[in-house]
Swiss-Prot record:
NCBIfam families, per database record: GlnA
Cofactor(s) the record lists: Mg(2+)
Amino acids binding L-glutamate: N240, G241, R298, E304, R316, R335
UniProt-recorded name of the protein: Glutamine synthetase
Organism: Bacillus cereus
Record-annotated site: Important for inhibition by glutamine: R62
E.C. code: 6.3.1.2
Domain GS beta-grasp, first and last residues per copy: 16-101
Cofactor detail note: Binds 2 Mg(2+) ions per subunit.
Regulation: Inhibited by glutamine.
Subunit structure: Oligomer of 12 subunits arranged in the form of two hexagons. In its feedback-inhibited form, interacts with TnrA in order to block its DNA-binding activity.
Length: 444
């Protein structure tokens, strides 16, 4: 990541004819928000004097205490590569602060920084994330609204003409590279109209920032191609949903602490403790990793998404997989997370779960090399394999009963997250869906 000073930003804004700056942040539900300012207000923004109404943002504060401040992270300065009508537009990602100058505890980005400090207190220097976000491309109607008509009928690793999203995907990659992303690969996914673009791992804050920027770029470029990009976990019945596998690693002084050349599978004791912590707390962090009603339509057998809490060195049916790379690339892949999740909240909970395993020297169960999807319930019980929550309602109950994951969110975020998601569940469970009409109207 480039390191910028205020003087660098003033100079670049002038040299590149920047006319507007988006001061970007993320709300409780993972939705990108921004306050756009003209370049004439850049000095005020860089002096941390830009105020906004926090009571209007999901999960922030009440109307009686609404004044909040945007503190830009100078190292997130980037100029959007697409052309604006009058000058260019730049972006700064911000942390949220209270009026008294203290970090706002309801800011997901600030909260992740808090958990990272707990990691540093244990002697680790970096928590790295390599995300694999998937998305669908749908056609839009004459009014620009998304339809359910897919852009192509391609499958895994297909080429054009089966992969009609190829040009759109290439343009997304080019725009991302102009913004400083190191793209490792892009390809068509298993389901028709489904795509994946993988970018290089980075520290947790940078990677979460990148995920949010990635979503914005994907949606923007798709729209230019007359398409609608969605990160909804399961937009269509009968095909794979979209996940966001998270490849995690802990570093100490530039060394990957998960790697031990002499360990079983060349994994260190800390790696095994970390895996055990992830498995122990997986049912509790599921509400955060899979935060929508729709998320649980993806977590069903038969569609390459994990439903069971287990781990393996290669097998892709468990929740946790250990990819083959070793040395500095040794990592723990958590496969349940979906792209509707707030990345800052997910990373806080995954880190807290893994650190709990390390602090308490938890031991993971035996690795499962069988296809869990074809195991009977009795076989799973004998192997100690438990199910992930099957609904958002179940996941919320499990979250509230888990002290480690609750503490990873903090009181403010936990309270407002539970409130928002219970409200979402209540709306869903009282709706009458088309499936019910098709199933019952003629029968009864």
């Amino acid at each position: 990541m480039a390191r910028y000073t205020k003087e660098d930003i003033f100079r670049l804004a002038k040299e590149e004819n920047v006319k507007y700056i988006r001061l970007q942040f993320t709300d409780l539900l993972g939705v990108i928000k921004n306050v756009e300012i003209p370049v004439s207000q850049l000095t005020k923004a860089l002096d941390n004097k830009m105020m906004f109404d926090g009571s209007s943002i999901e999960g922030f504060v009440r109307i009686e205490e609404s004044d909040m401040y945007l503190y830009p992270d100078l190292d997130t300065w980037v100029i959007f590569p697409w052309t604006a009508e009058k000058g260019k537009v730049a972006r700064l990602i911000c942390d949220i602060y209270n009026a008294d100058g203290t970090p706002f505890e309801g800011d997901p980005r600030n909260n992740l920084k808090r958990v990272l400090k707990e990691m540093e207190a244990l002697g680790f220097s970096d928590f790295n994330l390599g995300p694999e976000p998937e998305f669908f491309l749908f056609k839009v109607d004459e009014k620009g609204n998304p339809t359910l008509e897919l852009n192509d009928n391609g499958g895994y690793f297909d080429l054009a003409p089966m992969d009609l999203g190829e040009n759109c995907r290439r343009d997304i990659v080019l725009e991302l590279e102009e913004m400083g992303f190191e793209i490792e690969a892009s390809h068509h996914e298993v389901a028709p109209g489904q795509h994946e673009i993988d970018f290089k791992y980075a520290n947790a804050i940078r990677s979460c920032d990148d995920i949010q920027t990635f979503k914005l770029v994907v949606k923007t470029i798709a729209r230019k191609h007359g398409l609608h990009a969605t990160f909804m976990p399961k937009p269509l019945y009968g095909v794979n949903g979209s996940g966001m596998h998270c490849n995690l690693s802990l570093f100490k002084n530039g060394e990957n602490v998960f790697y031990d050349q002499n360990g079983d599978l060349q994994l260190s004791d800390d790696a095994r403790h970390f895996i055990a912590g992830i498995l122990k707390h997986a049912p509790a962090f599921t509400a955060v990793a899979n935060p929508t009603v729709n998320s649980y339509k993806r977590l069903v057998p038969g569609y390459e998404a994990p439903c069971y809490v287990a781990w393996s060195a290669q097998n892709r049916s468990p929740l946790v997989r250990i990819p083959a790379s070793r040395g500095i690339s040794t990592r723990v892949e958590v496969r349940s997370v979906d792209p509707a999740a707030n990345p800052y909240l997910v990373m806080a909970t995954l880190l807290a779960a893994g650190l709990d395993g390390i602090k308490n020297k938890l031991t993971p169960p035996a690795a499962v090399d069988r296809n869990i999807y074809v195991m009977t319930k009795e076989e799973r019980e004998e192997a100690g394999i438990v199910d992930l929550p099957a609904t958002l309602a179940q996941a919320l109950v499990t979250l509230q009963s888990n002290e480690v994951i609750s503490n990873a969110l903090g009181d403010h975020l936990l309270e407002h997250f539970i409130e928002a998601k219970e409200f979402e569940w209540d709306i869903f469970r009282t709706q009458v869906h088309q499936w019910e009409r098709d199933q019952y109207m003629s029968l009864y």
